[in-house]
């Protein structure tokens, strides 16, 4: 499998991600991809060859192995990693589509034409929805594979000995799994890292939705508050007595000097 191509995808989408998205990429690449390539494949390399049953009946070890390991851990993890990282490629493709559209727009209207996008990689409009749906899809894929692992391998356990009575075995035979403790440790490790990735994806979804809601409702709240604030267009005036000879009146603005409204000789 070409893991260099997968690394290129993860590196390309890193510049379009939030802080939580960068943490997710680090967890996927370091704790899942590298561990899978360096260690997991070596641990499960001898899974069928060293699956030994205490019988010489031809075909019995093969059917017993298929009974307890219908799908290999390694192949399930490989499929899971591919499906989890593919949505990140959609984000990169969406940004590339924006760049191509911007290039054609400038070729048609000239280099001084107003830009279609203020920031090509800014998560607005369709790119925001693409990024959000990619997060939901990644969380759903990891959750689905955890459920599949739980159904196939009960409680993610790896027993040392399994009892098999499948045809063509003549009777119930005991079969022994190679390196069960080591395989159990790696299984738990991959399950925990997948759960962490699910938590990071859901946290990023909450962050994006919350930030978007604040951007939408904050201007409305400020506009509503300005409507309720009445301007001081009619300052209060106080009427007081004016000149004692003609009994004129004086208009006095609160806090200011008096203004004589009468007529003086």
From Swiss-Prot:
Entries under SMART domains matching the protein: CNX, Connexin_CCC
Primary localisation category: membrane
Intramembrane stretch boundaries: 2-13
Keyword field: Cell junction, Cell membrane, Disulfide bond, Gap junction, Membrane, Transmembrane, Transmembrane helix
Residues annotated as transmembrane: 21-40, 74-94, 131-151, 185-205
Pfam family, one: Connexin
Disulfide bonds: 53-175, 60-169, 64-164
GO cellular component: connexin complex; plasma membrane
An MF annotation (GO) of this entry: gap junction channel activity
Cytoplasmic side stretches: 14-20, 95-130, 206-265
Family, per entry: Belongs to the connexin family. Beta-type (group I) subfamily.
Subunit structure: A hemichannel or connexon is composed of a hexamer of connexins. A functional gap junction is formed by the apposition of two hemichannels. Forms heteromeric channels with GJB2.
Job of this protein: Structural component of gap junctions. Gap junctions are dodecameric channels that connect the cytoplasm of adjoining cells. They are formed by the docking of two hexameric hemichannels, one from each cell membrane. Small molecules and ions diffuse from one cell to a neighboring cell via the central pore.
Name listed for the protein in its UniProt record: Gap junction beta-4 protein
Natural source organism: Rattus norvegicus
Taxonomic placement: Eukaryota, Metazoa, Chordata, Craniata, Vertebrata
